[in-house]
Amino acid sequence: MTTQPRKILVTCALPYANGAIHLGHMLEHIQADIWVRFQRMRGNKIHFVCADDAHGTPIMLNADKLGITPEELIAKAKADHIRDFAGFNISFDNYHSTHSEENKQLTAEIYNKLKANGFIKSKVISQLFDPEKNMFLPDRFVKGTCPKCKAEDQYGDNCEVCASTYSPMDLINPRSAVSGTTPIVKESEHFFFDLPAFEGMLKEWTRSGSLQSEIANKMQEWFESGLQQWDISRDAPYFGFEIPGAKDKFFYVWLDAPIGYMASFKNLCEREGIDFNEFWAEGSDAELYHFIGKDIVYFHSLFWPAMLEGSGYRKPTNVFAHGYVTVDGAKMSKSRGTFIQASTYLNHIDPECLRYYYAAKLNDRIEDLDFNLEDFVQRVNTDIVNKLVNLASRNAGFIAKRFEGKLSDKLEDEALFAEFTAQAEQIAAYYESREYNKAIREIMALTDKANKYIDEKAPWVIAKEEGKEAELQAVCSMGIELFRVLMSYLKPVLPKLAERAEAFLQAELRWDNIHQPLLGHTLAPFKALFSRLEKKQIDAVVEETKALFAAANKAAEKTEAKPTALSAVKPIAETITIDDLAKLDMRVAKVLKCEAVPESNKLLRFELDLGDHTRQVFSGIKAAYNKPEELEGRFVIMVANLAPRQMKFGVSEGMILSAGTGGSDLFLLSADNGVTAGMQVK
């Protein structure tokens, strides 16, 4: 019985139109592209769309800083993004923008349906307002002192030191991140999406069994803490879509951004005559998958399905989340040259190298992927050049010189060929479940077997013996046949290498003809299929990245008219007395254990030795220390008489001291040699 092709729509998260594509973005787009290319090889009806996320305050402010319109800024970003994705052979059927007529119409339609169905509420809220810039300030554009732990220079929605969340109104000494002025409080009517009304549906969706276990578990935590109404409006000035019937009110960027998936697909539908409703209507039998990063799971697993449900559209079949990219075990860094832009990479290295390396490490779990530069060079050269391509080159020469490019009319080892083709469904299952690392492992194991076969048959020896022409042709043809099977399996990962292999083989690499050998087939002249990756290419990428970072810093210094309250060195705090200082009991503590708190993006948990007892302390320095275990054994300075604080993850019994501006720019304070745990700082 013939199986009907599946109808599938795939999206990637929308890159923000306020910056360049980097290798972190490329993890997701390569992951999705491999899956899409595999589905095409299997004969399924699949569409692959994306778009730029083109709205929001940061775009408005950056355009103003550059002296251009927001429309000009996002147009350039879109052109750059399309160029970079094409450079990595990402096979989108359409790449659009959320600042489009399709998105404007769909956003208004969905909002009006939600409103008509009673899911939009309004209430007057108090907000911080920048009187100099004449604008309300989003949470991330306010900074001040944390109301809980008193840490300075914290954002308006959460503290990076103690991980507390709060309202910008609660900040101590708030200031505008736009102008540096002290904001005032103003009231404004805002519109809210009634997310709690969808709790039952969301719980049922979570229990469907299709979501990744990490997402399902995280959603359960959110249910337990209680769903809240979601503010979907922003006040003018704002770059985005105006809310119908609400003067000077705009949709929050995260309201219209996911609708951008629908808008990009609608744009494709109108251009190619595809039925939009076949994929988006309630009750659709098409499959809908979103590939996203773990940082935006909240929006895609709660708000987005609820919005769709409330407006009469179908929900996603699944949401596939992945982790972050680290480089050599650390967070991507501009100063170290590891915050690598896609365009910088493409200036020096074949994109297929990165596609292969990511595939060799990607699985179906939400895990960070380490891009180890030394391992990158070794793996590409070992697997692709030394094993895979060499299999073709070491046999093609004999076929060309001795047999005019014609393959044998029989298989030299039918059992071995059957063993290779028998793995087709297992490898397909690995691709289907996004366990690319297992697929690559299986393919490379077969590649080793193919090379072992050639080593044992030794065609270079057979070629010197008289009367063994048929054997030589059969052995070398077998090597070419095995290469064809391997390249068929790798075609979703290495599309350009597959194209060159197809030109050499003079045959299309298809999943449905893997079992059909090219008996008596004539090959094209063999040309080099792939070049070795050299360390100097990696060095060039790193150096160019450093240079770009340095140039950007220099340009920023030139354009900065004057230091703001955010960029200047912080003034010395209010004078205190010696009696005030004496209240602080600061101690030297030895780190016995340090580990990341999985449920937090910012916290590390420390177990500290204070000489006569141990303590647990949580510290918001996760972004600065990617390998917390390396802190074990170090001496740190802590405030020992700070009242214990109950946090979500346990009790924090003190505060560890660090210096810096926050985020990844934090540095633990330590003591000189000779100190012991428990010593008092005087």
From Swiss-Prot:
Its cofactor is Zn(2+). Its main location: cytoplasm. The keyword Repeat does not apply. Zn(2+) binds at residues 146, 149, 159, 162. The gene is metG. Its EC number is 6.1.1.10. Is required not only for elongation of protein synthesis but also for the initiation of all mRNA translation through initiator tRNA(fMet) aminoacylation. It is found in: Cytoplasm. This is Methionine--tRNA ligase. The keyword Zinc applies. One of its GO terms (biological process) is methionyl-tRNA aminoacylation. A motif ('KMSKS' region) lies at residues 331-335. A motif ('HIGH' region) lies at residues 15-25. Residues 580-682 form the tRNA-binding domain. SUPFAM superfamilies: Anticodon-binding domain of a subclass of class I aminoacyl-tRNA synthetases (SSF47323), Methionyl-tRNA synthetase (MetRS), Zn-domain (SSF57770), Nucleic acid-binding proteins (SSF50249), Nucleotidylyl transferase (SSF52374). Disulfide bonds: none annotated. Binds 1 zinc ion per subunit. HAMAP family: Met_tRNA_synth_type1. Pfam families: Anticodon_3, tRNA-synt_1g, tRNA_bind.
